[in-house]
């Protein structure tokens, strides 16, 4: 199962989402779990080095070859943290995806970036949006949820703005974050109907 975490825009929560999804998979013990850091910035690897995830192997390398090799593992759950943009690594990962998780924020230019990511995703691959760092109870969030609903884009999760979730390698993964991303993981790995 290849879960690709992607958005053409940077700074939307891709790394946080990828790390939490891999941690959830590792805790479920459903076979080998591989977390691929395909972003040249190396934030996923930095996070992993500071706080290794139980049951999760890290693969570093922002190259098409490295990503492809990692995603060819038959029995593994592979979570790929892609770089922003539409580069060859992103396209290669999306081309091998079994599910695409698209982290985004509420408001701003986010919808056009998500639509660009969806346009690069193969039609037969399930994809869903996760609104990260959401300010609960705001008009921006309500409008964003309404937008995705009207466009029939699956909303796989809303992750509220919490320092404990988005603090990166500075602290351990939060239980709240693990619970929220467990729901995203369940949607990403659901059998198509």
Model-identified regions with their sequence ranges:
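Inter-motif core of Ras-like GTPase G domains
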Residues: 85-108, 114-115
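Short, aromatic/basic amphipathic alpha-helical patches
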Residues: 46-51, 141-151
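Conserved nucleotide-binding/hydrolysis micro-motifs of P-loop NTPases
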Residues: 40-42, 108, 134-137, 163-164
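P-loop/Walker-type NTP enzyme "switch/lid" segment
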Residues: 2-12, 19-92, 166-174
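Conserved C-terminal guanine-recognition region of P-loop GTPase G domains, centered on the G4
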Residues: 112-133
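Beta-strand-loop-alpha "switch" segments that mediate conformational coupling across diverse proteins
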Residues: 135-136, 145-175, 188-192
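Arginine/glycine-rich "motif VI" loop of SF2 helicases in the C-terminal RecA-like domain
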Residues: 26, 119-125, 146-153
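Short, well-ordered beta-strand core segments
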Residues: 78, 100-101, 127
């Amino acid at each position: 199962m290849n879960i690709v975490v992607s958005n053409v825009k940077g700074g939307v929560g891709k790394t946080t989402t990828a790390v939490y999804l891999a941690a959830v998979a590792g805790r479920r013990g459903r076979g080998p779990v591989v977390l691929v850091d395909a972003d040249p910035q190396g934030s996923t690897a930095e996070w992993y080095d500071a706080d290794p995830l139980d049951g999760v192997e890290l693969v570093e390398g922002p190259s098409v070859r490295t990503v492809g090799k990692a995603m060819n593992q038959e029995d593994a759950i592979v979570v790929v943290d892609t770089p922003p943009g539409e580069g060859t690594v992103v396209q290669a990962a999306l081309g091998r995806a079994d599910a695409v998780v698209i982290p985004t924020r509420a408001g701003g230019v986010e919808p056009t970036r998500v639509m660009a990511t969806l346009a690069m995703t193969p039609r037969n691959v399930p994809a869903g949006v996760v609104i990260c760092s959401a300010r609960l109870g705001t008009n921006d969030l309500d409008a964003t949820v309404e937008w995705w609903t009207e466009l029939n884009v699956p909303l796989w999760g809303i992750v509220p703005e919490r320092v404990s979730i988005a603090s990166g390698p500075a602290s351990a993964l939060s239980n709240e974050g693990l619970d929220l991303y467990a729901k995203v993981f369940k949607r990403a790995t659901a059998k198509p109907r």
